């Protein structure tokens, strides 16, 4: 799976932050084709055509029906062992640097085996990345999701 470039990560988070939140899941489903995203027919599941390739995107709503979280994989190298971890660490560091250059220092970081970094975005949104042993995952929280962060 091709990885997002650091600039593509920032661009997508900013593009999502500029959407007119709050927005219901139904309204988001109608808007998704403008982003190059397509509803799969399964609850919360979209496919997205990013520069890095097609990805599954999960869009979750709250009890009121408003979207609160959008998540997708940024990088999942086809490597193993030490090479995989080194590649993931390089990508993670690159995403952290790009986000920090754009939005300032992270509002939250977690060090260790599964590091996390999160930034405050315009319109009271949050961008978060998490690295585990296989991939780097991006999470965008709308204002409806960010208020519980």
What are these regions (language model features)?
Residues 1-113, 120-126, 130-149:
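Short helix/turn-capping signatures at newly exposed starts of structured segments
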């Amino acid at each position: 799976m091709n990885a997002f470039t650091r600039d593509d990560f920032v661009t997508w988070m900013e593009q999502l932050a500029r959407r007119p939140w709050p927005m219901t899941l139904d309204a988001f489903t109608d808007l998704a084709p403008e982003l190059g995203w397509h509803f799969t027919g399964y609850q919360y599941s979209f496919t997205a055509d990013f520069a890095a390739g097609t990805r599954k995107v999960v869009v979750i709503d709250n009890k009121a029906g408003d979207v609160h979280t959008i998540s997708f994989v940024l990088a999942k190298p086809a490597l193993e062992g030490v090479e995989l971890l080194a590649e993931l660490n390089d990508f993670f560091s690159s995403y952290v640097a790009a986000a920090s250059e754009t939005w300032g220092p992270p509002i939250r970081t977690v060090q260790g085996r599964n590091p996390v970094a999160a930034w405050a975005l315009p319109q009271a949104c949050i961008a978060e990345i998490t690295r585990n042993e296989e991939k780097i995952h991006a999470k965008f929280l709308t204002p409806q999701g960010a208020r519980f962060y």
